[in-house]
Amino acid sequence: MASTQVNPTRMELTRLKKKLATATRGHKLLKDKRDELMRQFLDLVRENMALRQKVEAGIRSANVNFVIAKAGMSEQALNTALAAPKQAVYLEADKKNVMSVDIPVFHYKTRTADENDIYSYGFAFTSSDLDGAVKSLADILPDMLRLSETEKACQLMAAEIEKTRRRVNALEHVIIPEARKNIKYITMKLDENERRDRKSTRLNSSHVSIS
């Protein structure tokens, strides 16, 4: 029994009471953190699902247009049209701290602001379906980046939730109950010692009176 190994002194009792107060405050703070993490995690999961559907729809649309364009163009003409892109995308990775979790944030910029620069070819020898494929992919770029952010954020927040849950459980089921048990044990021992001392004092007083 762990409590029998505790030194039953008032100093130890004071220390344990402080430890219990700290653990109780920490338990509440960690529970609040866990609950807020769960709330934000669920928001991210919902956003992630919506983004995934949107991105997959955009990719499907691009694939359909590309297949149609490929069927109506020679392979050489298609390869030539896509060989030298005019536009370029520059990506910067940053991070923001959310509830002690470093969440990735992506920023991008294009080489030029001209929307037509996504087309690396002239329109004389290509089909409108190829234009549609290129436009679909260009349009979903922001959502693809945001999807990457939310995917990683969900992974990181899930790990933090699990870590916080273990700490809450350790406080709730081990540290706090053990501190309370030890406080109860020391209090009982101190009361026993006090009663024994009072009894001993009365006996000594009686002996003195008789003599």
Residue ranges: model-predicted function:
Residues L203-S211:
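Single conserved hydrophobic/aromatic residue that forms the stacking wall/gate
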